[in-house]
Swiss-Prot record:
GO terms for biological process: cell division; cell wall organization; peptidoglycan biosynthetic process; regulation of cell shape. Catalyzes the addition of an amino acid to the nucleotide precursor UDP-N-acetylmuramoyl-L-alanyl-D-glutamate (UMAG) in the biosynthesis of bacterial cell-wall peptidoglycan. Belongs to the MurCDEF family. MurE subfamily. Transmembrane segments: none annotated. This is UDP-N-acetylmuramyl-tripeptide synthetase. Gene3D superfamilies: Mur ligase, C-terminal domain (3.90.190.20), Mur-like, catalytic domain (3.40.1190.10), MurE/MurF, N-terminal domain (3.40.1390.10).
Amino acid sequence: MALTLDACTLILKEHHLLKSVALNGDSNLNMTGIAYDSRKVTADTLFFCKGNFRPVFLTNAKEAGAVTYVAEQPIVEGNGMNALIVTNVQKAMAVLSAAFYDYPQDDLFIVAYTGTKGKTTASYFTQSILQDATNKKTALFSTIDRVLGPKPEDRFKSDLTTPESLDLFHDMRQAVENGMTHLVMEVSSQAYKKNRVYGLTFDVGFFLNISPDHVGPNEHPNFEDYLHCKLQLLVNSRHCVINAQTQNFGDVYAAATTTTEPENIYLFADTSYQPAQPVNIDFRFENQAMTLAESRFKVTAVSKKAIQLGVSGDYQLRLIGDFNESNATAAIIGAALGGADLIAAQQGIRRLQIPGRMETLAVEGHGQVYVDYAHNYASMKALLSFLQKEYNQPKLLVVVGSPGDKGVSRRAGFAQVLNEYADRAILTTDDPGYEDPATIAAEILAGIDQDKVDTTVEIDRATAIKQAIEESQPGDIVVLAAKGADAYQKVRGVDTPYPTDMVIAKQVAQQLS
């Protein structure tokens, strides 16, 4: 992979990003490396000065072999280097990274998901189906991990829901070189806020739902900005699939129609849903049977274009909850648009078990434990309301924490949902970052009505889990929320190893047996 200085200049001009160029040598200079982290610079590297940039980073990059830097203003430490001064370094990084890695998106059929809840689950379902349809040639970029190929060494833990653009195009190119033909990925609102997917057009873009989340000093200033960023996925997709039951449906559908013809927009909803405005629902789904281990549901194509996809039928799901049937229906539609047939869809849905999603453990002499990634008001409400209904109003004990440095609005959301459904809550640690976990817990606690919800704080997460399980009685439900299968706690910039909630729950169960 390589990129000349002339090519960089032309690309930046084409995207109206270039302010000025300062050359220090041959404009045909061939750059064989690309980086935004000075620790990853090698000889003849193109270096981006982005984010929380400090001039010493450019000094380090220059010493390591960087020959050109991209920034929004000239930097003294870059004297002696070529300088590309741009209006927006994040956008510049996206378009130059795509070119450096030779536009790998052109070699992939890309299905992308956005939504406040369900992105990860729907993405896993879609990849599972497409793995059958493509003979295991479907990559996955999710909140949990990145799957770039068929081998174990092609699987990596994710740091961000949507990677930085340079990493995104690198991983796409690696996936293509590993023989992948399809890619399923999550696209966060921050990906558009920070231009991580700038210039990308998706083959299929999904809008699952929207509710207030990710609003805070380090994320979105308000809900309107959050919604606007979410909508950009539809504006940049060739086919759009929308959950017709989403909040702000009118705004969502209008965004899709700005760049996509109606015949390439698909709507889905459960059979009981009657839209407030006259729209044609293309797919309906309906629960047929549910146990505490699985659910069976039916997907029916209603419109002519939906029938042509050929995926109407009965499905079996190893995840319970009507919200998971909705996610699975989305995946069936997305995979069908990517070439999957009914058999691949049924097999892919039936076999999948997603780590950290509705994992359950029965503890002898105590309650039933559920581990789930539900990490905001909307997903917690869906989870707790479902468990309350299925178990006929059990006592609900919830262990939960909220992350530091982001998603400040989640804290009030957790308090609200605990007030609505929980009998007992233990507030604990979940990726505190640079904040004090006790302060985060106190913010959640401030919104809880303790006359309704017996609430305590136990900062050590393992101890909190042990306490909740020990307290529980047969017939109770213990929910270990928001962390899923995450094997780390993010503390002051360091990923600190953590056994996972389920591992700790199993250890406690063994001690109690």
